[in-house]
Amino acid sequence: MGHLVSAVETAKLLLSRCHSLSITVLIFNNSVVTSKVHNYVDSQIASSSNRLRFIYLPRDETGISSFSSLIEKQKPHVKESVMKITEFGSSVESPRLVGFIVDMFCTAMIDVANEFGVPSYIFYTSGAAFLNFMLHVQKIHDEENFNPTEFNASDGELQVPGLVNSFPSKAMPTAILSKQWFPPLLENTRRYGEAKGVIINTFFELESHAIESFKDPPIYPVGPILDVRSNGRNTNQEIMQWLDDQPPSSVVFLCFGSNGSFSKDQVKEIACALEDSGHRFLWSLADHRAPGFLESPSDYEDLQEVLPEGFLERTSGIEKVIGWAPQVAVLAHPATGGLVSHSGWNSILESIWFGVPVATWPMYAEQQFNAFQMVIELGLAVEIKMDYRNDSGEIVKCDQIERGIRCLMKHDSDRRKKVKEMSEKSRGALMEGGSSYCWLDNLIKDMIK
């Protein structure tokens, strides 16, 4: 979902800046496409101009054994859809096909773009430093037979282009250690060099060192690309009314993304930390019983079954425990003073945009790297646990969580001031003459020349 929203917002940005462009978004239609995705796409169709179209590809799941096979299976459908688009627009007055923008995990679609004789651009939803990291890991894997699993088991450090500090083995991202995900990640990364450029959801002021370290492929840091208008306030009145009653910057918001959940034992430690900290809190709590491959956890039907006995009564007046949360609306609210987060890149960009400090608690994907970058490299976050993995069985104890929350909520900290300053820079990057504004100009010129 996060990739789709960022891609659509990028499409809108391109259309607003270049009136000769039209964009068609092709969406995989498989069993893990949730009602939230369909509702989001429907809302975009209703509000978008005819220059932005959405097409669901045919549902075809026969013989799919991995994510890579899912992508390969879609190639004929993508080709057929693009052929129909170009045939429909084959008159002299109609726009020509100028290129493909493909998701960072869908580089197999470069083959389809090549068949049409047009360039491809990678849409990269993580940060520039992580792209540098992946290119470096791919290089030393291919040239030196680097094994990230062995590196993770050591106390070693890795020198990565784009990072000022040495990268510690303990922060090796979960995705790199996964036998399921590492091979396709490597293959995708190898293919980035075949693209004409990489569009990155970041901005120069946030990742200047990483961006300046790039040589190839060409990059376009055009972010932060966020959907901050559809903030969910109107459909989540109870949550927003509760926040309205809280003092400014007083609430700790705990939210771990669409796939973030904890065991009952870990939930009890978090509850203990929140109670002991004494801070007001809004906690988005998802059921740990994962439904299956790539599916998001659901909300608890009864919170009493997972929370400590008497917890809700003892914290009455300063707490609100919820299921799914309208994260953008909560971060935008003046009562929110800090975010305890899984360190997903979209969440990091949203917290920076609204000037809300983060306490890192990474869980999966590249989030351990993001946590290292935010805490050590950029000094924009505090650490609860930088090397946590949701499949490790580790339990982070109450006192460690409480320390992180107390540090997060310090109102006069230098870190909070740095986040506020970076918030202003994130907004300035998108304004006329700003860094991302200029990079987007360069991208458009490259596309339509």
Curated annotation (Swiss-Prot):
Catalytic class of the enzyme: transferase
PROSITE patterns: UDPGT
Presence of the UniProt keyword Signal in the record: no
Pathway connected to this protein: Pigment biosynthesis; anthocyanin biosynthesis
Residues the entry annotates as binding UDP-alpha-D-glucose: T125, A325, Q327, H342, W345, N346, S347, E350, E366, Q367
CDD domains hit by this protein: GT1_Gtf-like
The protein's Enzyme Commission number: 2.4.1.115
Biological processes per GO annotation: anthocyanin-containing compound biosynthetic process
Entry's transmembrane regions: none
Amino acids binding an anthocyanidin: H3, A365
Catalytic activity: an anthocyanidin + UDP-alpha-D-glucose + H(+) = an anthocyanidin 3-O-beta-D-glucoside + UDP
Protein name: Anthocyanidin 3-O-glucosyltransferase 1
Protein source organism: Manihot esculenta (Cassava)
